[in-house]
Amino acid sequence: VALCIGLSVYAATALADDPFRPEAGKFPPLEKAHSYRGELVFVDHANRRGSLRVEGTGKFYRNDPHPFAMLPYGIVRYHGAPADLRDIPLGTLMHVRAFLPPDPKTSVVPVLPVDSKSKDAGHYRGTGIFPAENHVLLLEDEPSHCLREGLVWKLREVEIHNGEGTITATRAPAQGDAPKAVEDMMTFDSATRIWRGSERIGVARMVADAAWPASGKKKLGGQPVQLGITWKPAPGDGLGGAFTRFHISDIWLDEAAIEQAAQFQTETHKAFIRGRWMPAWVDAVEYGKFGRATVTATLFGGMDASLYADFQKGVQAQMNGAENTLKHAGGHYGPGHIASNGRITAITQADGKIPLGSSGIQIQFETDLIIEGIRPTRVIRVRPQSWPSRQVPREEYVNDSLEERFPTPAIFPKY
């Protein structure tokens, strides 16, 4: 008996110590994700992967690009709106919530030791720059992060010489203040975009309006704004000065300005999803006779509400197999050529808290000819017939090769 109890305790302890990995068919809890941020330096948009220069404890410019992959239900946000990786300019500072690879054997990016984030990378790079948690649930730029968290940047002081300089600011709750907020000093220059309402202005206009001095310093009194943040190499030999100093690409001076930016990005993403179809995964399949089937699927989250509104009971639709990269399974004559045709017979909205990655919307789809790729836990794409039937470019669908279905991590340099 004592031996059995001992083995049970050991097994329970071992299970508790096992690192968390997302499972197929389940949306992982956001609170179990590892958080970090870094500069976007490479994008393979067709395979939903790329590299970030992750901020650690050392000199930022020395940090090697760190590969990441989006989970199939992973969400990208830019300017406070849904986005695709192709929408994000290189150099943008991104906030990340990520997990260990769900299945290391099929990871499209290099798999690292679980404790990588705690190891000192050496060469003045410090710790934290190579997290093993490189499968991303949420990837968002600075204004998206602040809007989601209810934060703003409060400008404290500007210093300007010859049209460029630095801004000192604190990130704090939009309502109230953060007594222990740490001041950040960031650079700007004449290329920094400044948005006021629907108008784009620049540094020269801020000087002309006497909002900023022509030269020297000025206190700004905690003016609340949203900032777009990037990174650019700083002057000097890298032996001294600030280890990490970020650069301001955009300043949104008021709510109208950031709302307009979000609206433009929303329209860009809506057009993209209508052309590529809504991603989802299969919860269950009930097979009938002679190829007939009823498919229950959950639509992925993070899209504009108007896209979900197009999924209505009784509408005709198409459903196609897809990979974890969201690539269509075949598309020589368009993804609709081999997709299952049918209609949506039921729509269910989940109650309670919806996990990030899920829309909470479940559809039932009846077809008289189900294709191979539509199986439980598999990723699919689905299109209401009201959406346009379009071709997709060659890099966005798979053919017969294993390399296209399971992209290798070998494209990433070993620094």
Predicted segments with their positions:
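Short, flexible, surface-exposed loop segments at domain boundaries
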Residues: 9-73, 78-415
